[in-house]
Amino acid sequence: MDQLISQLNFKSHNSIIHSVDSIGDDTCYVLDLSVTPNLLAAAGSNYLIKIYDRSNNTILNVLSGHKDAINETKFIENTNTLLSCSSDKTVKIWDTKTGQCSQTINQQGEIFSIDLNGDILAMGVGSMVVLYNLSTKKMIRKFDCSHTEDVTRVRFHPIDKNKLVSCSVDGLICMYDLEQADDDDAIVHVINAEDSIGNIGFFGSAYQYLYTLSHTERLATWDLTTGLKIKHYGADLRSTLSDRYKFEINYFISCIYDNASNQLILFGGDFNGTGHVFLVTPDEVIQISKLENVHTDVIRNVFWDKFKSELITSSEDSKIGFWTNNPSITNILKINNDTSSNKMKDDKLKSKKTSPYNK
């Protein structure tokens, strides 16, 4: 039965140009965003990270030290400490109040992704997954055989922190049980997505599902309990949505899970800076909102602050956009990821506990 749900209806309330006057002409792409209730960290294509005060969007500090592209940033929860990883083969730990780098962690390859579980730092280093203890400043473990190409994302499970998921250009999604001492036993699932994976995220009431976005803009969902595919939304979802809604979809950015409504939201856009917001249901992808009249180029990042009901976006036009959600009521089938898996299509891939290279 159709249920009335609150529609996401984002309206722009502010935007800023990502530049620092004192450093001259340093306007640049914003490659990654990290946000706390009070701070916003924006990593630029000029290898600088700028720290903004969210109350007035003024710049508090500029973090300088990386020598190559900054791929991901993470705040340590409830602190002003920021971690950043880079293609310069380092992770840097920053005091955002002073702007100083307190530690540099050197690795053997480019670091494309990081995630945190207390003192444990997970890194995607080249084709390896490396675990590092921030307290002892020592590497504690590495998985160097689970992937054959660059690891693009590492993510700790939101509830079961002993579980870690990685994805790679090699098309594999690996789930690890870090309580297992033996590396082979620790690899719970090796899933072949048959496509280079660029982004992943958890969803479901117990975060028992995973979404994947490939570098070819393909969306799929997976059951982490079984390692089986739930749904693949088509080889050319962009064209499907463009034809259905009569506007251009050139790329997808990421998905955000709203646990209050149990809904998975997909963000995409066009090359002229218009963003599109979609509801991912068990059977299809439904357009529910637009992000208009702020950006003029590709949108790189979205961050949804559910507590402040604010969406933050960054783009290749050097702008950071701030959007307020003004909900309206629409008649759309509400997604229920806990009860509707039996409605989802077949086309499942079995998980493999054998060699991850058997494709």
Curated annotation (Swiss-Prot):
Q: Does the UniProt entry include the keyword Cell division? A: no
Instruction: Give the WD repeat ranges.
Output: 23-62, 65-104, 106-144, 146-186, 192-232, 294-333
* PROSITE patterns for the chain: WD_REPEATS_1, WD_REPEATS_2, WD_REPEATS_REGION
Q: Which SMART domains match?
A: WD40
Keywords (A to Z) from UniProt = Repeat, WD repeat
Q: What Pfam family does this protein match (any one)? A: WD40
Quote the PANTHER family the UniProt record gives: WD REPEAT-CONTAINING PROTEIN 89 (PTHR22889:SF0)
- Name of this protein: WD repeat-containing protein 89 homolog
**Which organism is this entry from?**
Dictyostelium discoideum (Social amoeba)
